Amino acid sequence: MQVILLQRVAKLGQMGEVVNVKDGYARNFLLPQGKALRANESNIKSFEARKAQLEAQNLETKKEAAAVAEKLDGQSFVVIRSASDSGALYGSVTTRDAAEAATEAGFTVGRGQIVLDRPIKDLGLHTVTVTLHPEVVVKITLNVARSVEEAELQASGKSIQELAAEAEAAADFEIAELFDEIGAASQDD
């Protein structure tokens, strides 16, 4: 099916282009979301008449997205999740979780705007892409941790494995000290 794009669509084309897409993609995605019109003569004529208005509208939304992008780019958001000692999450962090974290910080980001390169299934810092407008894309960081204190430590550059190793070393040291004290006490007797 041939359609006229009303806005830029990733991996498809720019606004105003007539492109050939599969019928299901057009019927189920492009047409219902208002991203395209069927490419027949009447729609082409009406699009040409509205083209200047649509371009102005697109430019306005792009400016708004760029203003939000300026504030949002490079931001870090904390997501608290329960995890095993090795750092593997019980479940995963989804686009909804990322959108909620950004919304709690005062940004209006929908879960459809979040793009995860891969599922987030472990603790740590993860870079996530946010598409605010088809032409405005920013990167944010999700700090996935078990607690706020752990998130602060991760943000300062320490990994979960380093923290676990430090805790284990401290526990071993305390046990060794305890045995030394017990040994010294038994020698005194």
Swiss-Prot record:
<dbReference type="GO" id="GO:0005840">
    <property type="term" value="C:ribosome"/>
</dbReference>
<keyword id="KW-0694">RNA-binding</keyword>
<comment type="function">
    <text>Binds to the 23S rRNA.</text>
</comment>
<comment type="similarity">
    <text>Belongs to the bacterial ribosomal protein bL9 family.</text>
</comment>
<keyword id="KW-0699">rRNA-binding</keyword>
<keyword id="KW-0689">Ribosomal protein</keyword>
<keyword id="KW-0687">Ribonucleoprotein</keyword>
<dbReference type="InterPro" id="IPR036791">
    <property type="entry name" value="Ribosomal_bL9_C_sf"/>
</dbReference>
<dbReference type="InterPro" id="IPR000244">
    <property type="entry name" value="Ribosomal_bL9"/>
</dbReference>
<dbReference type="InterPro" id="IPR020594">
    <property type="entry name" value="Ribosomal_bL9_bac/chp"/>
</dbReference>
<dbReference type="GO" id="GO:1990904">
    <property type="term" value="C:ribonucleoprotein complex"/>
</dbReference>
<dbReference type="GO" id="GO:0003735">
    <property type="term" value="F:structural constituent of ribosome"/>
</dbReference>
<dbReference type="Pfam" id="PF03948">
    <property type="entry name" value="Ribosomal_L9_C"/>
</dbReference>
<dbReference type="InterPro" id="IPR036935">
    <property type="entry name" value="Ribosomal_bL9_N_sf"/>
</dbReference>
<dbReference type="GO" id="GO:0006412">
    <property type="term" value="P:translation"/>
</dbReference>
<dbReference type="InterPro" id="IPR009027">
    <property type="entry name" value="Ribosomal_bL9/RNase_H1_N"/>
</dbReference>
<dbReference type="GO" id="GO:0019843">
    <property type="term" value="F:rRNA binding"/>
</dbReference>
<dbReference type="InterPro" id="IPR020069">
    <property type="entry name" value="Ribosomal_bL9_C"/>
</dbReference>
<dbReference type="InterPro" id="IPR020070">
    <property type="entry name" value="Ribosomal_bL9_N"/>
</dbReference>
<protein>
    <recommendedName>
        <fullName>Large ribosomal subunit protein bL9</fullName>
    </recommendedName>
</protein>
<dbReference type="Pfam" id="PF01281">
    <property type="entry name" value="Ribosomal_L9_N"/>
</dbReference>
